[in-house]
C-alpha cells in the first residue's frame, strides 16, 4: 500500500459552523450520586464526556453504589480547548475525584472506557488500596490505521485535527463528544500510554477487561499488553462479538453490565 492510499482526511481549520459536539443535548458534566459505602469512579474516554459512562453509572447506583464521574479538562467544550490541555491535567482531575470519593466510601473501584481505562491504571499505580479496576476497550495501544494517520500529520504545523469516521455510529448512541480527534490530544495519549506501560508492574489489583471485536480505534492486543505487565492475581478478559469501540454503550450493553456486576460482586464479597 502506498502513502497516497492511506492519506487521511485532515482539518487545518478550527472554525466550523457546526456544533463541536455530537449529541450536545446530553448531560456531560461531572456528577456524584450518593449511595452506600462502596464507591465507583468512572472515567470517560478521549474527546468524550461523562455521558459516555452515565448508563453504566446508573446501573451501579441502582445496585446501591456511590458513583462519581468527572469531566476531563478540555472536554465538553471545543476541540481547540482540548488541544491546550495535557495528560498531567487529566490525571490531576482524576486524582481529585478519587480522593473525594474515597473520603465518603470504605471501598472504591475505578473503571474507565478507552483513555479512561488508562487513567484508571494510573490511579491504581498510585493507590494500592483501590479494590479493583474495570477497563472497557482500554486504549493501551491505538489501532495501526489510526497510528498511521497520527504519525503522518503530527509534524505539520498546519493540521489541527483528524475527522472521525465513526460519527454515524455514535450519533445513534447516547454518546457525546467531539467530531474530530485533535492531534495534540492524540500525542498526549501516546505519551500517557508510554508512561503507564512503564508502571504496569506496580499494579496488583483485580482487573476486568472487556473489549469489542469490532473495535477499530484501539489495538485489539491492548488487553493482552496490560495483562502481560501487571502483577494482578485476579484477572478476567471478555469479548463482545457485535460491539465497536464504545463497548459500554453498544448493542451488547446488557452483557457488559452482567459481566461487570458478576465480577464486582465476586471481588467485594
Give a label for each model feature.
Residues 241-269:
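Catalytic active-site module of serine/aspartate enzymes centered on a nucleophile-bearing elbow/loop
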Residues 56, 205, 219-228, 239:
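Short alpha-helix in the alpha/beta-hydrolase fold that links the catalytic acid
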Residues 134-144:
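Active-site nucleophile loop of the alpha/beta-hydrolase fold
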Residues 61-79:
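Conserved alpha/beta-hydrolase
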Residues 112-116, 120:
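Gly/Ala-rich beta-loop-alpha elbow adjacent to hydrolase catalytic centers
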Residues 28, 182-199:
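Active-site nucleophile elbow and catalytic-triad environment of alpha/beta-hydrolase enzymes
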Residues 203, 209-211, 215:
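Short beta-strand/loop motif that positions the catalytic acidic residue
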Residues 47-57:
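The serine-hydrolase catalytic nucleophile loop
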